[in-house]
Amino acid sequence: MKLKTFLASTTLALASLASTGTQAAGTLTVALHQDPGNWDPIATFLVSWGAVGGQVFDGLIMRTPDMKLVPGLATKWEFLDKNSKLRFTLRPNVKFHNGEPFDAEAVKFTFDRLLGEEGKKGPQQSNYNSIEKVVVVNPTTVDFVLKSPDPVLLTKLAGYGAMIVPPKYIKEKGSQFFGMNPVGTGPFKFTEYKPKVSVSFERNAAYWGDAPKLDQLVYRFISEPATQAAELRAGRLDVANQIPLAMIETLKKDSKLSVISVDGPVALALRYNTQRGIMKDREVRKALTMAVDRDAIIKTILLGHAKPIASFQGALSFGNDPALKPLPYNPAQAKAMLQKAGVKPGTQIQLDFRGPDSNFREVAQAVAGYLQAVGVTVSLKPYETNVLLNDIIPNGKTGEMWQNQWGGWTFDYDNTAYAMYYTKQRWNPFDDDAKLNALLHMQRNTWDQVARKSTLQEISRYVADQALEMPLYSLNTIYGLNKRAKNLALPSDGRFRFVDATVD
């Protein structure tokens, strides 16, 4: 399903749920599978943060549910001096939730912080390293001075690390306090955070845009998809962002509920630890990939709510190469390749995965079964999600394989590939490949989108040839909904914006 088709069908589906009378307000309750643990925009990389961040923060640029870039805290922008400078005209008379003014100094503070020592502590800085500095022209005008081309910069300014933060508040309270008590310019104001339980917001009646219609917005952190489904059926949720695939048809039969499944940007793979044991051998890595029937996994476990991938990106990603095909499922050839490489039957490897993800647990079990059939014994190692993402992977403490899952929120392979394959990036604890580094630099340093797409496709082919990962699938974005919630904007990237939502 193409993105435009998804938007049209989603609009029709949601419109059919909407009442024709005066819309109510009330409280919208949303389940998220993960608590990011910190609400500071520069401290995160998680889709679950993006699902919340757009309620409390704004960027200079915003992205609509149909992925169009529109003015946010900036009313307009233009490239100057042969694309070496990006000038923003800022929206006047905007205030942060604590009352301090939004102006050019706030923009400069935000990016000085992101690009400075504070930004080094989090995963966002590398997304914005094309920016040399931000210069205040006047209170409503700023210039971004660029040290290199960045053809994805405008998109990246519409999310995550580029969200504008309040200088005075952070200077007075400190970054740690800010991370637990966020203040922005967004449509909802933070009221309470209970770690691993919930985060709550109230309506920002003074919002510079259309004021939200809801009185309250509550996110509950529910890691188990089955629990999300149970809470949805019990009427204690309005939106569930993860439900067991096996329960989709059951939920659809409930007259109070609906389920929407659309193409999404989330890609899943098993990344290989190329410095450990048998994984040092590229032919072994290829053999293991060929030993797993991904089509069968998609059909029997994911019930068709995913598509096979040949590289770590979905079909909606700029840079995806339709001509690149996954290695075929061929267990006999895989077994022969392992034997030729000297891998002894019964060789043991470890697969690390996100323990609370019951859907992927089944996938991991299936992978273990396929590898067992070619003589490789897999030990499944579940981790608390934040432990795996914040400690085990970035510190190079993984087993031979680990669950690699990426939201791909820019819908551009650049963001994914740089984070995954460039030397010493957070998600690349093991590999140091000069050719990959050069290709990644090349595509980031041109405004020529045709040339850039060609380079990105070359990167995906090279990664496949080196067998750095076992590409699995691109997962559909699936929402379970209570029909009492109306006018929901449900983008495929999971970054909610509930300005128009109401609850009967």
Predicted regions and their residues:
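Gly/Pro-rich hinge or "lid" segments in bacterial periplasmic/extracellular proteins
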Residues: 68, 158-212, 216, 226, ...
